């Protein structure tokens, strides 16, 4: 029993070590390998659109056969030309050249906890970093496919703001060419991180107009600014898509380096994932779209879609649209927005345990209003659910402690003959009605819960910068003073004293080292996870002490 229990504890230590040092290797890979898919393209390939306001805005737009033309110089758009839009949850800037969202900040999510007035910036196209949401009209008559460059839109004003009491805000960008009038409309709603981009096409020319809507996310290979290094980990940074054939497929930067992906799909979505936040383009459900990943001529990574061809007769009007989400990974919101989009909150292979844990945490938090106390009450609830199992385990361990003198006598009797010693131990266990595996049950039960809670704390945006009390101001990062890990190590030491001492000296030495090893590992774990483990240990100590004393009292009474 002691050997198996030691193996289990060492295994948990190894798992802990892997989670701290190997997260990027295990979690950063695509869930499914991507392949180059040859399809009959229902629409032109997704174009390389220009870098934006601080770069030479080259056309670099491929023709209908997917070949890229040589870049052409077009007017440079400066910061003063950007169109600024502010709602209660979004603060963004639109580049009039092409109508791309070149900058986007999230006012309700501070960049750092010690600078609450500096919002987290999701999109940025200022030179040092490239990350933006692009859309346009390509194809036969699309203004974004012109050899002379993308359209430069005009607006009635340079600044727009959602006023108090106003629930909707429309920002219209206008452009005319060859008798065709275009309006690119951005529609914002109070409290929402999703916005609708609609193209209104008024064909006043004397010939039919034909084009395709495209929408894409473009990003360079820079690091994730939302990923904390305080835990010693890095979360997944890369693209993802959802189709009816392949729900939730990750496409990493390495996958895109290996080759482009092209698939014609119905509806779905394309997204770019990072720690706590996600951006996604969502086309109309009924459209057949060409989804594509690729690397552009500047080395940026692109995931996007091109919609079906749209034809507008002379004198007629038409519109086409798509939805952009740019904000936190809020599961409830994402689930309502598009099927499968909530899967971007990736809880790993134990998602079926992690999701109920998060659901419980949310409901507890709605009552207590503090995520730290929510973790404590969740731990108490879990311990209560598994108490019958734990009680049986502690009873087995108490009986093991009671027969410790007999085990010592067997050790003296058989010396170094391990085979005879093992046989004698099994006979003793059978005689005393002891389950040699009984003491392993608490560890087996805790491991999947421990791992699942790890994903929940690290992936759920609700935990970002969530304070507890005293020195714990952020449950999603390590304890800045390492107080909780030290307390955790102390509780492990106390818990170890309640367990029977292994008869083998080497096993005993290994067991004594476990609190020190675990304390070292937990130094870099999120404070919320260490809090869970501390509370779990305290409750385990209380349960074990109570059950052990109860059994000892019953044994003494029977002996009397």
Swiss-Prot record:
Q: Does the keyword Zinc-finger apply?
A: no
| A GO cellular component annotation in the UniProt record | plasma membrane
Keyword match Repeat: no
User: Which intervals of the chain form a coiled coil?
Assistant: none
Q: How does it sit in the membrane?
A: Multi-pass membrane protein
Keywords in alphabetical order, please: Cell inner membrane, Cell membrane, Chaperone, Membrane, Protein transport, Transmembrane, Transmembrane helix, Transport
What GO terms in the biological process aspect are recorded for it?
Answer: protein insertion into membrane; protein transport
Q: Where in the cell is it found?
A: Cell inner membrane
- Bilayer-crossing residues are 7-27, 367-387, 437-457, 468-488, 515-535
What molecular function terms (GO) are annotated for this protein?
Answer: membrane insertase activity
Role, per record = Required for the insertion and/or proper folding and/or complex formation of integral membrane proteins into the membrane. Involved in integration of membrane proteins that insert both dependently and independently of the Sec translocase complex, as well as at least some lipoproteins. Aids folding of multispanning membrane proteins.
Q: Which PANTHER family match?
A: CYTOCHROME C OXIDASE ASSEMBLY PROTEIN COX18, MITOCHONDRIAL, OXA1
The Swiss-Prot or TrEMBL record describes its family as follows: Belongs to the OXA1/ALB3/YidC family. Type 1 subfamily.
* Subunit structure and binding partners: Interacts with the Sec translocase complex via SecD. Specifically interacts with transmembrane segments of nascent integral membrane proteins during membrane integration.
Name of the molecule in the record? Membrane protein insertase YidC
């Amino acid at each position: 029993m002691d050997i198996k229990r030691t193996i289990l504890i060492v295994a948990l230590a190894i798992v802990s070590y892997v989670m701290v040092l190997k997260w990027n290797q295990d979690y950063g890979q695509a869930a499914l390998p991507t392949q180059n898919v040859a399809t009959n393209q229902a629409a032109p390939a997704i174009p390389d659109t220009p870098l934006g306001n601080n770069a030479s805005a080259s056309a670099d737009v491929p023709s209908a056969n997917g070949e890229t033309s040589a870049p052409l110089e077009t007017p440079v758009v400066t910061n003063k030309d950007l169109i600024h839009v502010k709602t209660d949850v979004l603060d963004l800037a639109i580049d009039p050249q092409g109508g791309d969202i070149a900058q986007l900040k999230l006012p309700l999510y501070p960049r750092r906890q010690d600078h609450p007035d500096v919002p987290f910036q999701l999109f940025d196209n200022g030179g040092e970093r490239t990350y933006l949401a692009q859309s346009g009209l390509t194809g036969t008559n699309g203004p974004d496919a012109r050899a002379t460059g993308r359209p430069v839109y005009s607006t009635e004003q340079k600044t727009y703001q959602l006023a108090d009491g106003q629930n909707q805000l429309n920002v219209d960008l206008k452009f005319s060419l060859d008798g065709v009038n275009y309006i690119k409309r951005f529609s914002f709603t109070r409290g929402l991180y999703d916005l609708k981009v609609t193209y209104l096409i008024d064909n006043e020319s004397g010939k039919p107009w034909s084009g395709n809507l495209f929408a894409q996310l473009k990003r360079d290979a820079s690091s994730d600014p939302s990923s904390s290094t305080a835990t010693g980990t890095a979360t997944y940074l890369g693209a993802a898509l959802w189709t009816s054939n392949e729900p939730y497929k990750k496409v990493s930067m390495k996958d895109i380096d290996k080759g482009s992906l092209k698939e014609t799909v119905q509806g779905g979505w394309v997204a770019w994932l990072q720690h706590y936040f996600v951006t996604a383009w969502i086309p109309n459900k009924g459209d057949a779209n060409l989804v594509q990943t690729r690397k552009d001529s500047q080395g940026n990574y692109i995931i996007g879609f091109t919609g079906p061809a749209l034809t507008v007769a002379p004198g007629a009007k038409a519109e086409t649209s798509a939805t952009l989400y740019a904000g936190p990974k809020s599961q409830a919101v994402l689930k309502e927005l598009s099927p499968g989009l909530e899967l971007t909150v990736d809880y790993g292979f134990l998602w079926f345990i992690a999701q109920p844990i998060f659901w419980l945490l949310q409901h507890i938090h709605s009552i207590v209003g503090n995520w730290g106390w929510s973790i404590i009450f969740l731990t108490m609830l879990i311990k209560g659910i598994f108490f019958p199992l734990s009680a049986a385990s502690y009873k087995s361990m108490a009986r093991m402690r009671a027969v410790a003198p007999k085990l010592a006598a067997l050790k003296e009797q058989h010396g170094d003959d391990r085979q005879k010693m093992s046989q004698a131990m099994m006979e003793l266990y059978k005689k005393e009605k002891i389950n040699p595996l009984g003491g392993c049950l608490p560890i087996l039960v805790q491991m999947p819960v421990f791992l699942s809670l790890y994903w929940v704390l690290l992936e759920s945006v609700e935990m970002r910068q969530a304070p507890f009390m005293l020195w714990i101001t952020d449950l999603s990062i390590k304890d800045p003073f390492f107080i909780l890990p030290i307390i955790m190590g102390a509780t492990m030491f106390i818990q170890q004293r309640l367990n029977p001492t292994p008869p083998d000296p080497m096993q005993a030495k290994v067991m004594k080292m476990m609190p020190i090893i675990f304390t070292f590992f937990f130094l870099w774990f999120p404070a919320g996870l260490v809090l869970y483990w501390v509370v779990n240990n305290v409750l385990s100590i209380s349960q074990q002490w109570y059950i052990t004393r109860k059994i000892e009292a019953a044994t003494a009474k029977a002996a009397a």
